[in-house]
C-alpha cells in the first residue's frame, strides 16, 4: 500500500505544495496499522537515563530490535536523529535503525528540509562515529497524490488545520 502524498496548492508560496503535517500523520498511521510501536523510548533499559523517543520501533519474529526515524525537517533535525541512533547503540537497546527521508524532488516541494542525499553525505562524512547499522530510505512521489482541495476547496482551512481534522483523510 502506498501513502498518497497530500498536496494543497496555495497554502504556502510556490513550489511548496506538500502538506507536511498531514503527510507525517499519514506515515504514523501506516506504521501503527502494521504493528509498529509509535514514539518508543530510545533507551529501553530499566534504569533509563534519557527521555529521547524515536518515531517507531518493532521487534521482529527473529528478535531483531529496529528503531525508525522519519525526518521531514531541516538539517538540525537530521543531526538529532543521528544522535538518537547512536544513543540506541550505546544503550544496547536496538540492533539496527531505519532512517526515512524525502528524495530531492519531494524535498523541493516541502520547504527547507533535508533530503536523503544530504543525509547520506552526512552519514558518510561521520561514518566513524555512527555506530548503529542504518538502512537509509528515500521516499518520493509515485504520481498518486491527493489534492486536498478536492476534499475541501478552501485553502485557508488547510492553512489552519488541526490534527483531529485529518482523521477522515488519513483513513481514506
Predicted regions and their residues:
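Generic surface-pattern signal
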Residues: 5-8, 28, 32, 124, ...
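A short, surface-exposed helix-loop junction/capping segment
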Residues: 2-14
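Short catalytic-loop micro-motif centered on adjacent basic/acidic residues
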Residues: 67-71
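Active-site metal-binding core of divalent-cation-utilizing nuclease and nuclease-like domains
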Residues: 13-17, 24-64, 74-83, 90
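Structural motif
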Residues: 65-66, 96
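Domain-level recognition of nuclease-like catalytic cores that cleave nucleotide substrates
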Residues: 104-172
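Catalytic cores of nucleic-acid endonucleases
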Residues: 72-127
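Generic alpha-helical secondary structure signal
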Residues: 21, 25, 114-117
Amino acid at each position: 500500500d502506498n501513502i498518497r502524498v497530500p498536496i494543497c496548492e496555495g497554502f504556502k508560496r510556490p513550489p511548496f505544495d506538500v502538506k507536511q503535517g498531514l503527510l507525517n500523520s499519514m506515515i504514523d498511521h501506516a506504521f501503527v496499522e502494521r504493528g509498529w510501536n509509535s514514539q518508543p523510548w530510545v533507551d529501553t533499559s530499566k534504569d533509563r537515563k534519557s527521555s529521547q523517543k524515536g518515531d517507531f520501533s518493532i521487534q521482529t519474529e527473529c528478535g531483531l530490535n529496529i528503531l525508525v526515524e522519519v525526518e521531514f525537517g531541516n538539517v538540525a533535525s537530521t543531526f538529532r536523529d543521528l544522535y538518537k541512533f547512536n544513543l540506541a547503540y550505546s544503550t544496547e537497546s536496538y540492533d539496527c535503525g531505519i532512517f526515512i527521508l524525502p528524495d530531492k524532488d519531494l524535498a523541493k516541494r516541502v520547504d527547507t528540509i533535508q533530503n536523503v542525499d544530504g543525509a547520506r553525505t552526512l552519514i558518510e562524512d561521520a561514518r566513524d562515529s555512527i555506530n548503529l547499522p542504518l538502512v537509509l530510505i528515500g521516499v518520493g512521489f509515485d504520481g498518486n497524490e491527493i489534492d486536498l482541495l478536492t476534499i475541501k476547496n478552501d485553502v485557508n482551512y488547510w492553512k489552519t488545520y488541526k490534527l483531529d481534522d485529518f482523521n477522515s483523510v488519513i483513513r481514506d
